[in-house]
Amino acid sequence: MAKKVIGYIKLQIPAGKANPSPPVGPALGQRGLNIMEFCKAFNAATQSMEPGLPIPVVITAFADKSFTFVMKTPPATILIKKAAKIDKGSPRPHTDKVGKITRAQAEEIAKTKAPDLTAADLDAAVRTIAGSARSMGIEVEGV
């Protein structure tokens, strides 16, 4: 018989930097999960990723105090800002443009995000990324 699920916890944790301090500790502690076990497993799983890159993670907590977790791809906005070499988007995105990315950069981001996007093909995924970039005040060349 399958284990009884008692809850799901959604967090964004920097790659390789999970520790028992908030938000990780309180979120897992409320469900009675072993915080250090999660931190070690998460840090080991994100070892090959760029340190500090925020990684969304969904933790499934079971009644026997065990857990599993699924890591998602980094948020598109983070990847877009990194490609455009800017710190934040425009406060008035359709009026003030703060940066540019090329179609090749948008394709690279779309390939990275592909597992989490609902797009049918690469071109649709690129258009999704381009839309996110435009809403941040970043111009996308060639889309």
UniProtKB/Swiss-Prot annotation:
Pfam families found in the cross-reference section: Ribosomal_L11, Ribosomal_L11_N
SUPFAM superfamilies hit by this protein: Ribosomal L11/L12e N-terminal domain, Ribosomal protein L11, C-terminal domain
Molecular function GO terms recorded: large ribosomal subunit rRNA binding; structural constituent of ribosome
Keywords: Methylation, Ribonucleoprotein, Ribosomal protein, RNA-binding, rRNA-binding
CDD domains with a match to the protein in the record: Ribosomal_L11
One term under GO cellular component: cytosolic large ribosomal subunit
Domain of life: Bacteria
Post-translational modification: One or more lysine residues are methylated.
Oligomeric and partner information: Part of the ribosomal stalk of the 50S ribosomal subunit. Interacts with L10 and the large rRNA to form the base of the stalk. L10 forms an elongated spine to which L12 dimers bind in a sequential fashion forming a multimeric L10(L12)X complex.
Stated role: Forms part of the ribosomal stalk which helps the ribosome interact with GTP-bound translation factors.
Family stated for the protein in its record: Belongs to the universal ribosomal protein uL11 family.
Protein name: Large ribosomal subunit protein uL11
Annotated source species: Methylobacillus flagellatus (strain ATCC 51484 / DSM 6875 / VKM B-1610 / KT)
